């Protein structure tokens, strides 16, 4: 059996998933305490918030945006704040609605995350701080948790109920 590259239509199914474009939609770096903090011995605490959203931009074309907010603090003082929207355009064809939602909610953000990690590490280093290595994330688990949370919050799903949370259309 030959291994098909991603995006190759599966025999008899017509299913296709192709990453067409990856880009930074928005990025911001703030370091309000520089250069004073460079001369201090600090032990920063870093917090990562992550969110995914999507929209259909044409039939079978989905823009997926992975938003990361990384804040490093020492006690109550912000050392740096990074806000990043890493985006991609995905062709998703031949999948059932639920399958498409799962792809957009977990597979697509997972494909974007390595690029987002690199962008965050680069901007933090260029800001004069030690490289920040964000740990891998299981996006299947995050998506499942978001669905579970939605089900417990509201039993009536209108298709937009997860707007603003992980992996759903906005």
What are the roles of these predicted feature ranges?
Residues 2-111, 115-170:
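N-terminal intrinsically disordered, cationic/polar leader segments
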